A protein has these predicted regions:
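Alpha-helical transmembrane segments in inner-membrane proteins
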Residues: 2-207
Length: 207
């Protein structure tokens, strides 16, 4: 049995590391280079180009990579917990709960720092995900499609509540900017907490 298990793991690892993975890595590397070279400021001919490159371009690119890795890790963990391939943060209401947490943090603490906003968004996303799992325990799952449908419905309710609160507090425009997901304003000193994602990814890979 040990030999069979080892052989199965070797075949699985062989399927993971094939030419498709190489193409994907090359494409991602190309996009990273494109992100580093994209911007209004001329980093090659302008004064202080290297400083601007270190302050804005590198942090922006790293923030993009780490945010994407965070979404991927969330999707992986959710799929492992629910044993459903259709489950991800956008189909479970997690992103909507994060938006609600961010909005409530800004309303309660107008001058909140970026760290405080992140903590509020993460806490709300965690609570919302737990509520989603509680819903699943009370729903008869006749099909694998029921799980994302429940999540999308829950997310729609949370999104409507968030929009209502934003409208009442005159923060609807800010809410639209947040949900646009723009990384253009990311600078050094604003993204370092995202390195926690790399540690979590390493822990999941080891386990």
């Amino acid at each position: 049995m040990t030999t069979a298990t080892t052989a199965a793991r070797a075949r699985t690892r062989g399927r993971l590391f094939d030419w498709k993975l190489g193409v994907g890595i090359a494409a991602v590397a190309g996009l990273l280079c494109l992100s580093l070279l994209t911007g209004v400021y001329d980093i090659f001919g302008g004064d202080g180009g290297s400083e601007m490159f270190a302050i804005t371009r590198i942090p922006r690119t790293l923030a993009l990579v780490l945010a994407g890795a965070a979404m991927a890790m969330c999707g992986l963990v959710m799929q492992l917990l629910t044993q459903n391939r259709f489950v991800e943060p956008t189909t479970t209401g997690t992103t909507e709960w994060a938006g609600l947490g961010l909005l409530l943090t800004m309303v309660a603490i107008p001058g909140a720092s970026i760290v405080t906003r992140m903590v509020g968004a993460v806490a709300a996303a965690f609570i919302g995900t737990m509520i989603f799992f509680l819903f699943l325990r009370r729903v008869t799952l006749r099909s694998s499609l029921i799980v994302p449908i429940v999540g999308i419905m829950l997310g729609a309710v949370v999104s409507a509540l968030t929009t209502f609160i934003a409208l009442k507090t005159d923060m609807l425009q800010n809410l639209g900017v947040w949900f646009a997901g723009s990384f253009t304003s990311v600078m050094r000193g604003q993204y370092e907490l995202l390195w926690i994602v790399a540690l979590v990814a390493l822990a999941v890979f080891i386990v």
